[in-house]
């Protein structure tokens, strides 16, 4: 994760083909810390590490209150992007379809990227 939003490649990585939330793209990650499913928590860990750098400049309570905004913002944006990928309205908040679709994709070993490419 880069504060500038750049993509950094430290390799060896891969891409998510067959949808499997527990898939690990980093071949040196034996415990699944960086699995697809764990990406949000790793993002929060990275933000915590960055916040530590500012701990002498910003009160701890303020840092904590800002870090607590991460998960709700991430979930909201993720759901909105999934709605967009699926051609659903932006204001749709019934996420059962998204969740069921991902379960089916995992069960049937559907190529994640190809599925959404074909859908578009």
Question: Language-model features: where?
Answer:
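Catalytic activation segment of kinase domains across protein kinase-like and atypical kinase folds
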Residues: 1-44, 52-56
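Regulatory N- and C-terminal appendages and interdomain linkers associated
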Residues: 30-120
